[in-house]
Design a protein with these regions (language model features):
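Catalytic phosphate/metal-binding cores of nucleic-acid and nucleotide-processing enzymes, i.e., regions
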Residues: 1-113
């Protein structure tokens, strides 16, 4: 199975403004995702980091990735996250409507975190 997992507010504390370096990991949630990885599932971390500041730019995802990919990759490593892919460029939005979506608190409550 393939899982696409957000970062801020999902596996770490939400950040205010541009303070991504201040995010603190939620170890129980990371352990849940790592277990899925260990069971052979494909894990992609997909984040909107940096997208708000470039929202009107057609190259927003490229610019966000150039600005924050290294920091985000290092955080995932430092936090012990196991994954297959890291993608920056998730559109900045207040609400996502998706036929395969699940609210993160519901997912982690159902999976023992």
């Amino acid at each position: 199975m393939r899982y696409c997992v957000d970062i801020d507010g999902t596996i770490c504390t939400p950040t205010v403004g541009r303070g991504y370096e201040k995010a603190q990991p939620w170890s129980d949630r990371i352990s849940t995702i790592n277990k899925l990885y260990d069971e052979g599932n494909h894990i992609t971390y997909f984040t909107a980091r940096g997208m708000g500041r470039f929202s009107d730019d057609p190259d927003a995802s490229v610019k966000a990735s150039a600005l924050l990919f290294d920091l985000t990759e290092q955080q995932l490593k430092d936090w012990g996250c196991k994954y297959n892919d890291l993608i920056l460029g998730k559109p900045h939005a207040d609400i996502f409507i998706d036929d395969k979506g699940i609210q993160c608190d519901d997912f982690f409550n159902d999976n023992g975190s």
